[in-house]
Regions:
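Membrane-interfacial terminal anchoring regions of lipid-handling membrane enzymes
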Residues: 1-14, 21-222
Length: 222
């Protein structure tokens, strides 16, 4: 209700994250629980209540993720130790690294309001299906507005074993990115480092935004 009051009555904007933290593999998806919370206030049905919010998806694109090596490390720990749980110290290290670590170029892109698309949805759908479709709509808007960097194309080519995106980066940029990945891998503190596994996980973090971006090209949302 506070958010509806702030937006509708006070005519002020509010920023809210689409999920709790970034996805470890950079395959970010909107949590339906966030939409359910937004639809708790306002008047009318779910669609009416969300239209009141005038939702504008925001895409944030980082050239580098300073936590990439920590995420890769956690992937191996969870693979090797089924009941592995991060400690409070681990969480604090992740927060500190994420806040103060180098991110390279950062781009913010605000997409257009989704109200027109919300109006087109079938209001007779069940709540789970409706929230699922709205989440997918927001995800498409965010993914379509990502800013791609050389590392995204290089990582995708490495994983596919092709040079499909070679036109998007130079030999110098490829060497720089490869050296960066090697440096980050060297920071991982594990007694039994599985380098091929860790490298693949890190490359996926940079390839997935491009994969999601390409998936929106047929829809061409703005």
């Amino acid at each position: 209700r506070y958010m509806h009051h702030t937006i509708k009555d006070k005519n002020q904007s509010i920023w809210i994250a689409q999920r709790e933290g970034r996805a470890k593999d950079s395959n970010d998806r909107t949590q339906e629980s966030v939409l359910k919370m937004l639809a708790m206030g306002g008047e009318g049905d779910i669609i009416d209540r969300l239209i009141e919010m005038n939702i504008l998806p925001l895409a944030i694109s980082y050239e580098y993720d300073p936590c990439d090596y920590l995420k890769a490390q956690e992937f191996q720990l969870k693979r090797d130790i089924p009941d592995y749980k991060k400690t409070q110290e681990d969480d604090l290290k992740n927060m500190q690294t994420g806040l103060f670590g180098p991110k390279g170029r950062v781009h913010f892109q605000v997409a257009s309001c989704i109200n027109e698309e919300l109006e087109k949805l079938d209001r007779s759908l069940s709540k789970p299906e409706l929230f699922s479709q709205i989440s997918a709509l927001i995800d498409r808007r965010i993914h379509a507005n990502y800013r791609m960097y050389p590392g995204n194309y290089i990582a995708h080519d490495y994983l596919s074993g092709t040079q499909a995106f070679a036109g998007h980066y130079t030999a110098e940029e490829k060497k720089h990115f490869t050296d960066y990945i090697d440096q980050q891998l060297a920071r991982i503190e594990l007694p039994n480092k599985d380098i091929p596994f860790l490298r693949e996980k890190m490359l996926l973090m940079y390839a997935n935004p491009l994969t999601n971006y390409l998936a929106t090209r047929t829809d061409n949302p703005k």
